[in-house]
């Protein structure tokens, strides 16, 4: 059973015991004070006043003592400030854009000579203004970063010497281009690459993305470049790896590859014809000796290009030193020969073809003889060198060197 108590006209009497003697303390006279007097006092306190408040006159108006009036004013201020603190906590937690307090509390807080009201308005509007400024700063900084990064990448692209104006939108591909050019390729190969590179601006422009997203694009573009450019290295034939020393010299002299047809011709002859015996070399020597007896007047040819030691070393060793000597006279062209010397050249080419069959993939014997033919070294100089070598007893050592080279090549 719950007892219902009427809340109307409820009076409480409170007795307070103090732990110290009061002495000659006299109890204050009873004061009549109600809520209407509280509201009237707060209206006076909250109004902006030009000067100080006359508390004595105000106490006489309310018919109370001065001490009671000051205590009541302090209590009203404390209540209003507690409401302001609660509003400030709400502003800090919710971070709302309109944290204006209630109108009644604001009008009450303005009684402190206008300072609490200004403080609430300033602190209330300070947090949202920071938020708005941060929101404004964030989208403004991002386009500036994007713009500056893109202009810096395009500036770095233009400085290395980009040939196409359409490549400025793809700086990742352009940065890789000087690296590929530094491999010492021929200018003709670089010209062959330009048509596929011109179709590369299909990649998305960097203006729509931040700079950090270009790293996967670089790896993807590297793979595409390697897949597109890898077949270009296979066009040079079988001996392109052995002629890497010639590329730096030929880039300065001419654009067309000088030894590509010879390399292909060597490949066809090596694959089509079988390896012959050593008797073909003996027949070669006999034919040269007979041709030397028939034409003694042609022995005054230049001896300087083919000394005896160099001919022996070119037959025995499989080095690449004879290639640059034959590479440069080839570009100069052979002189016009008479029909008789042309027939001798035909015989010498047949013999060099047989000598070319004896070697496997190395361009030591075949390419050195073909280079000497193309370099217009006369037949008489070769025959004279061979005859002098035979007369001095070097034929046996020469044949043993050739047989040793063939044996080490085919019988290993």
Swiss-Prot record:
Claim: Protein transport is one of the keywords in the record: yes
The annotated regions of Low complexity compositional bias extend over 98-114, 148-159, 310-322
Q: According to its UniProt record, where is this protein located?
A: Preautophagosomal structure
The annotated regions of Polar residues compositional bias extend over 115-136, 329-354, 361-379
The Gene Ontology CC terms held by the record are: phagophore assembly site
User: What InterPro entries has UniProt attached to this entry?
Assistant: ATG29 (IPR039113), Atg29_N (IPR040666), ATG29_sf (IPR039362)
Q: Where is this region: Disordered?
A: 92-379
Instruction: Provide one Gene Ontology biological process annotation.
Output: protein transport
Q: Which keywords fit this entry according to its UniProt record?
A: Autophagy, Protein transport, Transport
Ranges of compositional bias, category Basic and acidic residues: 173-194, 263-275, 284-300
What is the stated purpose of this protein?
Plays a role in autophagy. Functions at the preautophagosomal structure (PAS) in order to form normal autophagosomes under starvation conditions. Also plays a role in mitophagy and regulation of filamentous growth.
Provide the family line.
Belongs to the ATG29 family.
* Official protein name in the record: Autophagy-related protein 29
List the top taxonomic levels of the source.
Eukaryota, Fungi, Dikarya, Ascomycota, Pezizomycotina
């Amino acid at each position: 059973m719950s007892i219902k108590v009427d809340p109307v006209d409820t009076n409480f009497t409170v007795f307070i015991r103090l732990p110290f003697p009061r002495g000659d303390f006299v109890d204050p006279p009873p004061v009549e004070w109600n809520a209407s007097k509280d509201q009237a006092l707060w209206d006076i306190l909250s109004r902006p006043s030009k000067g100080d408040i006359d508390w004595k006159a105000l106490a006489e108006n309310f018919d109370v003592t001065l001490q009671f009036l000051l205590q009541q004013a302090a209590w009203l201020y404390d209540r209003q400030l507690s409401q302001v603190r609660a509003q400030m906590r709400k502003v800090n937690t919710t971070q709302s854009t309109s944290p204006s307090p209630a109108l009644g509390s604001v009008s009450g807080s303005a009684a402190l000579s206008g300072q609490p009201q200004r403080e609430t308005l300033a602190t209330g509007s300070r947090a949202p203004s920071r938020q708005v400024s941060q929101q404004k700063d964030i989208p403004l900084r991002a386009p500036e970063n994007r713009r500056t990064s893109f202009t810096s990448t395009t500036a770095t692209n233009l400085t290395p010497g980009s040939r196409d104006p359409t490549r400025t939108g793809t700086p990742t591909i352009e940065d890789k281009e000087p690296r590929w050019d530094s491999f010492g390729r021929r200018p003709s190969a670089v010209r062959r690459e330009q048509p596929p590179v011109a179709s590369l601006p299909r990649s998305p422009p960097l203006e729509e993305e931040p700079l950090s997203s270009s790293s996967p694009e670089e790896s993807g573009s590297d793979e595409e470049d390697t897949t597109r450019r890898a077949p270009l290295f296979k066009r040079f034939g079988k001996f392109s790896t052995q002629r890497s020393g010639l590329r730096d010299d030929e880039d300065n002299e001419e654009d067309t590859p000088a030894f590509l047809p010879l390399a292909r011709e060597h490949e066809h002859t090596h694959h089509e014809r079988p390896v012959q015996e050593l008797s073909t070399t003996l027949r070669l020597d006999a034919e040269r000796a007979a041709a030397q007896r028939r034409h003694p007047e042609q022995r005054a040819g230049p001896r300087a290009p083919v000394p005896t030691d160099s001919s022996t070393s070119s037959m025995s060793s499989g080095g690449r030193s004879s290639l640059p000597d034959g590479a440069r006279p080839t570009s100069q062209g052979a002189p016009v020969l008479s029909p008789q010397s042309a027939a001798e050249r035909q015989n010498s080419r047949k013999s060099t073809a047989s000598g070319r069959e004896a070697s496997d993939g190395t361009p030591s014997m075949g390419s050195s003889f073909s280079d000497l033919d193309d370099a217009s070294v006369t037949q008489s100089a070769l025959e004279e060198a061979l005859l002098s070598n035979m007369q001095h007893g070097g034929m046996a050592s020469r044949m043993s060197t050739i047989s040793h080279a063939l044996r080490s090549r085919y019988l290993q």
